[in-house]
Structures are given as C-alpha cells and as structure tokens.
Amino acid sequence: MILVDTSVWVDYFRGTDSPQAAKLDSLLGAEPLAIGDIVLTEVLQGVDGDREFEQTRALLATLDLVQVGGADVAVEAARNFRRLRALGVTVRKTVDTLIATRCIVSGYELLHGDRDFIPFETFLGLRTVDCGDALRG
C-alpha cells in the first residue's frame, strides 16, 4: 500500500510539475493508494470554494483511509522523534513524525515531496516511492 502525503496532493491539485505529482498521476487507478486522516484534513483545509471542496473530497474518498495516530503509533512516534534527536536530527513537524511512523509500523510506502521525511528513510527504515533524487539534489 502506498500512502500519499499532503505535499504531493498539493502539487497534484495545483497542477505543479513535480516528479511526485507525475508519479501520483500514474498511480491513480493503477495501484492501491491510501490517504491518512491527518493528510485528508490538511488537503481539504487548503481547498477554495464549496464545489472544489466537494470534488476533492469525492476523489479522496475513493482511497483507503488510514488512521495515522492511535496510542501505539503515538508512542512509537515519540520514540522515533527521540531517536532522531539523539542523532542530531531536528524534526520540524510532529505530523510528519506521525505519518512516517504509521508507514513504518504498517509497512506502507510513502509518496512524498517533503525533505523532512528523509531522516526517517535514512535512519529508521521508512520505505518511500522512488521519484528520482529530486529532493536530494
């Protein structure tokens, strides 16, 4: 299962030419995709207008909905934050820690366009969808 992060959805809906948005476009309807409940909230918060909101909500409702948090993930996310901090890595957003940890715990791949996930890949085994080295360059 591939969980798609907010950064990719924003690029996709804005028509931004990014490797991640192109990858999402190729995966829609071809691969099982999931959206986290927190990601759903973030994406829908950014939508202008009622009609666009309903169209976006309808599209996202076709995906598997994943509860990102929960007690076990919350505790493991705190552990992951502490592990990275001990390595000198500053995690800027708690939501990214939760999303990365849900993916690690559940064995999901993450499709993202956010450099903040790279330490989770490098040090904690987060599996991600290959879109080239666009974030690493």
Explain the meaning of each model-derived region:
Residues W9-V10, L40-V43, F117:
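A generic structural signal for short hydrophobic patches within well-formed alpha-helices
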Residues D50-E54, L84-R85, R127-C131:
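Short, hinge-like loop/turn segments at secondary-structure boundaries
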